[in-house]
Amino acid sequence: MEVILLDKIAKLGGLGDKVSVKSGYARNYLLPQGKAVFASEANVEHFEARRADIEAKLADVLATAEARAAKVVALAEVTIASKSGDEGKLFGSIGTRDIADAITEAGVEITKAEVRLPLGAIRETGEFEIAIHLHHDVDTSIKVVVIAEA
């Protein structure tokens, strides 16, 4: 199935690219998410007419993500207190939601979907470098310090 991409899609293409994808991927993901339209002649003409508007909107989203990344870098580190045992093992764990809430409380709006924990939840006290994925072109990181709650 031929579609026109309305956004940059990893390993597929960028804005305005006409690509061939499996019909299920187009019907179940690209089209409902608004990331692509069918590549009919009418849609091609309509897209070319709106191309500047779409590019401006994407540039605005990118600029917003870069501004948020600068705020995260300026924040440098965030501290989370959690109950733990004598050896530094936490009672429970610190997940993406906890980290996102701590960063948001520190003044930078972050959602749990933007926090990346490739090794899973944090289960001990210490300092951890956490990746933050704000946009497909904007990644940053922040130091999370987990301390024992008094």
UniProtKB/Swiss-Prot annotation:
The keyword rRNA-binding applies. Binds to the 23S rRNA. PROSITE patterns: RIBOSOMAL_L9 (PS00651). Keywords: Ribonucleoprotein, Ribosomal protein, RNA-binding, rRNA-binding. The keyword RNA-binding applies. This is Large ribosomal subunit protein bL9. One of its GO terms (cellular component) is ribonucleoprotein complex. One of its GO terms (biological process) is translation. Transmembrane segments: none annotated. The gene is rplI. Disulfide bonds: none annotated. Belongs to the bacterial ribosomal protein bL9 family. GO terms for molecular function: rRNA binding; structural constituent of ribosome.
